[in-house]
Amino acid sequence: MDPIRFVTHQGQRVLLLDFTASTPDQVAELSSRVPELITQEPKGSVLVVADFSGVKFNREIVEHIKIATAIDRPHIKRAAWVLTENLPKALYDSIRSFSAREIPVFDSREKALDYLVS
């Protein structure tokens, strides 16, 4: 199953970015694919959840994510991340600052999906 795919949650279409337990190289490769997909959608229309459970973050991964979140910003209606205390606050803050986006963090995919469609 493709880790980047649209799913339906409570009748709404949500883009799932499933980075669960991915290596740094996998996260970098997958995050580089995201903007091309999202920018094909109408502006302000995409609900997106990124699940980073079990990912070991480093500065390289953060740089890839910063770029992707900045490029796709106009197309995002709402976004949420799933993190399990694996992203240091300073790195999370640098992504938020660079992308000029507020990205709420949840401890489970279900909670993140519920937030997106609420």
What label would you give each PLM region?
Residues 1-118:
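Amphipathic, Lys/Arg-enriched alpha-helical "gate/interface" segment within cytosolic domains
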